[in-house]
């Protein structure tokens, strides 16, 4: 017989265009703690979890645009999220924009409670 896992779907709420990454990460960690309090084994965050939905704006400044993308996962800014998950013993999955050289891809990372990490990439349109 298979084992049962409990998955929490995290509702992020809005992220403003200029919300600092630290504020967003704090919200994510609070949601992760809340999911753990409901005995969730995994918490699922939505796509573009770390930023506002930036494609809605015509952003011409390449530097500003690059700020919405991740160059590594985990990176220096996102490492506390991974550490929080390890401390809580909870897995998570989150979608994020990844800065890469063409072809464009969408990425989703998954951290399992035992720290096994997988990155899934989909071909961009």
Task: Describe every region a protein language model picked out.
Residues 1-125:
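Hydrophobic structural segments
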